[in-house]
Amino acid sequence: HRIMDGEFYAYAKELKELGVIRHIGMSTHNPAVARLAAESGRIEMILFSINPAFDMLPASENMEDYFKETYDEQLGGIAPERAELYKICEKNNIGITVMKGYAGGRLFSAETSPFGVALTPVQCLHYALTRPGVASVMAGYDTIGHVDAAVAYETAAEEEKDYATVLSKAPAHAYYGQCTYCGHCAPCPAGIDIAMVNKLYDLAVMQPEVPAALKAHYD
């Protein structure tokens, strides 16, 4: 409400009326906040984090609350708050652009995936694109190979897109203990950028050797 009824939204609305921008969207990790936006009649698109692991998390005002303190051993399937959000967006013609579709690449490895089984880029993309209301997925690439792996979705067979087998084995608390780089733990009393440190760590452990670009952050 502070955003929608404050100076920031008023400024964005003014820019739209002047023709400087054509649409107004917003970004959030929280399904409750996203739902308020989708039902407000003032937001046209939402940038929202969607992947199989995140969809099993309960709603919270703080992404950090999704972890140890609140996970439920009996929790299973898609969190109802998120499923309802997707339906509301589709009903109200609010387009969802997906972020975190690959969970930072962690879903590609059995060692780092909360499911204990690796998913492919095609499976992750298919999962996101088959949610109600989803219009597109914003993926990140480091190499041409990453681009090729995503574009392969266009010609993939149905069996290559199938993610149901992996999801059927998902633990109840799918993303327990994992950092999502949301920044809600800030500020750190010691001045440490916790989200960035965890992001660099996750990128490093997914490579045979620490890339020079990552090392440069510590020079």
Where are these regions (language model features)?
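Glycine/proline-rich, positively charged
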Residues: 1-97
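Structured C-terminal cap/extension of enzyme domains
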Residues: 39-42, 66-219
